[in-house]
A protein has these predicted regions:
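Jelly-roll (double-stranded beta-helix
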Residues: 5-10, 14-16, 29-148
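Structured binding elements
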Residues: 20
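A cytosolic small-molecule/anion-sensing beta-strand core signal
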Residues: 23-24
Length: 148
């Protein structure tokens, strides 16, 4: 994760634990309102159904590994999500296309990932409006799985 960058807004994996392991640098996690700072070699297990977010507090890149148990369809969400993110001219300012793509991805994985609190409500409203102007450009779960 680049210097000073935040991960996704507070979110929940209702069916999965997410284990964060810092390989290089430092990672700040927020889980259920509690701040956890992880240094190189440290790990933390965010249990299923726990609202969490993370950021890199350093002025240099942080490398970390996130493991999901069980994996379910996380590979689909990450591959298609990063494809959408990387296709944006400014990934720090979500476009209508990116919002529609993420809305489509979340519908494909049926409740395996959801935004926590207000960001979820705001996202739902923006996605409904954005769908009036554009269609998703990411693969469906079925097409993604067929490509392996």
């Amino acid at each position: 994760i680049p210097a000073g960058q935040e991960g996704p807004p507070p979110h929940i994996h209702p069916l999965q634990d997410e284990i964060f392991e810092v390989i290089e640098g430092k990672l700040e996690l927020s889980a259920n309102g509690k701040k956890i700072v992880l240094e190189e070699g440290q790990s933390y297990n965010v249990t299923a159904n726990t609202a969490h977010s993370f950021l890199n507090p350093l002025d240099r890149e942080t490398k970390f590994r996130a493991t999901y148990k069980p994996a379910l369809d996380i590979d689909y969400m990450l591959v298609q999500g990063f494809d959408s993110l990387n296709s944006q001219s400014n990934p720090n300012q979500p476009s209508l296309q990116m919002i529609v793509d993420f809305d489509f991805i979340l519908k494909q994985i049926h409740g395996q990932y959801k935004f926590a609190g207000a960001p979820g409500i705001i996202f739902t409203i923006f996605a409904a409006i954005a769908r009036l102007f554009t269609k998703p450009k990411v693969k469906s779960l079925k097409d993604h799985n067929a490509s392996f």
